[in-house]
Design a protein with these regions (language model features):
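Short pre-active-site segment immediately N-terminal to the catalytic Zn-binding motif
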Residues: 306-332
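Propeptide-to-catalytic entry region of secreted or membrane-anchored zinc metalloproteases
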Residues: 168-269, 277-289, 318-322
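Extracellular and organelle-lumenal recognition/adhesion modules and their flexible linkers in secreted
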Residues: 23-170
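Catalytic zinc-binding patch centered on the HExxH motif and its immediate surroundings
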Residues: 278-306
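Hydrophobic alpha-helical membrane-insertion segments, chiefly the h-region
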Residues: 15-25
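Active-site recognition of the HExxH zinc-binding catalytic motif
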Residues: 329-344
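N-terminal Sec-pathway targeting helices
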Residues: 1-14
Length: 454
């Protein structure tokens, strides 16, 4: 009798243990993803059966306070190859200290490559990150509540994750657009600012975009060609972004609701935003900038072109044989910041765009830094080591586009275990990946102090 009771008791314990393990597995096991966050104790990770997409349990990140938290997986990739990462994202009460750079997003760890972050409370939406592997043979693909330069709190759910390999467009034909933001109607620091582009503003922006296209083709010795268009946006822009260096400006997230349909349809390689942020009576606070570059709209180069507050008394953007024969300089300068960033990310070493004085190039009255830009684009700057400047490969280093995935190949990414052997195998694999990640310099460049695995 005692043996029977003992066996029954043991069976009950075994069933309870299996039930507990099943609960823990179903709620907290993240397959073969690795979890990482900056501030331990402020983030919870779990599988949420109450929030499903396509019948699949979602992966939930909950930041109770501002944090940068994610789960990621390292995959092997081909060098200099396009990859498309997609997933469905849902958010609840997401707030960010830097909304332009942090929120719910897909990102590549160790880089600034990430999707435009999502804040607030939103229903399921498809998010896509197009990325160039450049010189890397591995990528750490992460799903994030936070960002490379900011922190977020709230909840984010991720589901239906896919990774595809494409075929790169290796032409040097660039498709450039300037969106003319006809109206700003934004509340800044409690004050409502309303400005509109004048017809003269629009004419100057259009003329300088045309001049820009001809100039960069010439400066590159026709190593690149440029097609271009201007698109007027009638709907008012109602939000602006801020940072301590530049004060207020137009970030990708601010303008995305107004231009994204055009961007997706036309596959631009660079985006200019033409805008007026002041007049002779008042101005939105800006820190003297007239152009801002080195930004991205997803993977596309993104620049601001601001019209002078007092255009009547300004020579800016106006061709004049006596005063200014290089009015397109701001367009050229901001575009070159994108090329500079692209080439730097490929691992090349060359002068910074603002290093002109170090190499003996001075700003000229009528032509600005025209000679510097020309020699910069032709890799014709004299240095102690010989000629330097932009390597010609930069003209074929264009943003990844959806058309690069016409013949996409799906990559096995989200490994769902089917039995206990698969589970144990994934746990061992996770442990090895954690040990490898801790010694990986790219990951160490991020500021994660906590890496955990189930």
């Amino acid at each position: 009798m005692k043996k029977v009771i003992s066996r029954i008791f043991s069976l009950i314990i075994l069933i309870g243990l299996i039930t507990a393990l099943a609960y823990i597995y179903n709620k907290y096991y993240f397959n073969d993803f690795i979890k990482a966050n900056e501030n331990k104790g402020e983030t919870s990770y779990y599988r949420d059966s109450s929030q499903k997409y396509n019948g699949l349990k979602s992966y939930c990140i909950e930041n109770k306070d501002y944090n940068d938290a994610l789960f990621f997986k390292k995959i092997s990739v081909k060098k200099d190859t396009p990859y498309r990462i997609t997933c469905m994202v849902k958010t609840e009460n997401v707030e960010s200290d830097k909304p332009e750079t942090s929120g719910a997003c897909i990102s590549i760890m160790g880089t600034a490559d990430q999707t435009i972050p999502i804040q607030g409370t939103t229903d399921w939406q498809k998010v896509t990150l197009l990325v160039d592997s450049k010189e890397q043979d591995t990528l750490d693909i992460s799903f994030r509540l936070g960002g490379y330069d900011g922190y977020s709190k709230g909840k984010a759910w991720f589901s239906d994750i896919h990774v595809e390999e494409g075929v790169k467009d290796e032409t040097s034909d660039w498709n450039v657009v300037c969106f003319l933001i006809d109206n700003i109607d934004a509340n800044v620091e409690g004050k409502q600012y309303t400005y509109s582009l004048t017809q003269e503003d629009k004419d100057l922006l259009k003329d300088n975009l045309k001049r820009f296209a001809n100039t960069v083709e010439s400066f590159s010795n026709n190593a690149m060609t440029v097609s271009y268009q201007t698109v007027e946006i009638k709907e008012p822009l109602t939000s602006l972004s801020y940072d301590q260096e530049n004060y207020y400006y137009v970030a990708a997230k601010d303008v995305k609701p107004l231009i994204d349909d055009y961007v997706q349809k036309n596959e631009y390689d660079h985006i200019f935003i033409g805008i007026r942020m002041g007049d002779t009576l008042s101005s939105i606070p800006v820190n003297e900038w007239i152009g801002l570059g080195s930004m991205r709209y997803d993977s596309i180069g993104f620049s601001n072109i601001r019209m002078p507050n007092d255009l009547r008394n300004s020579t800016m953007y106006k061709y004049n044989i006596k005063n200014d024969t290089f009015p397109e300089e701001v367009f050229v300068h901001e575009f070159l910041h994108s090329l500079e960033r692209n080439l730097t990310e490929k691992g090349y070493t060359f002068p910074a765009l603002h290093d002109n004085e170090k190499f003996g190039y001075e700003n000229q009255n009528k032509t600005g830094l025209k000679e510097w830009y020309r020699d910069y684009m032709r890799c014709n700057i004299d240095s102690n080591a010989g000629k330097t400047g932009l390597d010609q490969i930069v003209y074929k280093t264009k943003p990844i586009q959806l058309s690069d995935f016409k013949y996409a190949q799906e990559i096995k990414f989200e490994n769902v275990p089917h039995n206990i052997i698969d589970i144990v195998s994934q746990i061992i694999s996770n442990f090895k990946q954690v040990m490898s990640s801790n010694s990986n310099s790219e990951i160490n460049e991020t500021n994660y102090v906590t890496i955990t695995t189930d």
